[in-house]
Amino acid sequence: MKLLEGKVAVVTGAARGIGKAIALKFAQEGANIAFTDLVIDENGLATQAEIEALGVKAKGYASNAANFEETHNVVAEIVKDFGRIDILVNNAGITKDGLMMRMSEGQWDAVLNVNLKSAFNFIHACTPVMMKQRAGSIINMSSVVGVHGNAGQANYS
């Protein structure tokens, strides 16, 4: 039996990049995968097909993770489609680099909304599901920039 056989993992921001790699690894370990991204375009459909080729159930959901209501709606849809949520990986993230003196409030807010608020939104939506199951794991991704800092990334770190 594989490590995550029969589990359902939700990975945010997983149509490509690190999120996709996480989704694929969890699928290799037997987890069914629900993943989100701002849009499910050809990248998202390719990711879904790649995950399904590993013999597990997979579905991509278009979702603005920074929107509280939309996040709750997509989590309800995931539970309807998969029956449960065992693992949540808060991976969604963006960068909008710039020196503080040149950074707009919009740039600041965009990064914090996706990188921080989205984690709150998904935890808030998934926690009742996990509590009802009496089990669940939440993984919050972050960057080394939060520890070491980087010029132009005050909003990211």
Model-assigned labels for residue ranges:
Residues A31-A46:
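Conserved glycine-rich Rossmann-like NAD(P)H-binding loop of the short-chain dehydrogenase/reductase
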